[in-house]
Amino acid sequence: MAISHIRLTTAPVLVVPSVSMEDMDRYPDPERNLAELIMAVQSVALACQNLLLAAHDAGLGACWLCAPLFVPDLVRDVLVLPSAWQPQAMITLGYPAESKEKARAPLESRVLWR
């Protein structure tokens, strides 16, 4: 917990991607409403991936944290977010203090080809 606190309070930028269903269409079918929520969450996740890729390309370090999924009310309260917003993640951004080179595992060790 202390490490997360340090990451959150020392990062130059903190992005809190959120979902709001407030402006979305509502349907009488609960399954359709659930599908709409899932699509909204997926859209936010894809936007986050693009943000992470753009940050890397710009030489920024980024860290995806999923803590808001466990304490959404706390995140909304601390950041004074609208009650309809559902925080999905936190992304810290900044220039890395040090550069670490990681060896990549072969693609075949991570992908199953059929």
Which stretches of residues belong to each language-model region?
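Glycine/small-residue-rich phosphate/adenosyl-binding loop
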Residues: 1-43
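Structural motif
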Residues: 12-16, 62-63, 89
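Short secondary-structure boundary segments
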Residues: 19, 67-68, 95
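GST superfamily/GST-like fold recognition
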Residues: 39, 58-73
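Aromatic/hydrophobic pocket-lining residues that form π-stacking "cages" and hydrophobic walls in ligand
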Residues: 50-51
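Hydrophobic pocket-lining residues that define ligand/cofactor binding sites across diverse proteins
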Residues: 55
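Short, electropositive alpha-helical surface patch
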Residues: 70-84
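C-terminal helix-cap and adjacent tail motif
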Residues: 88-114
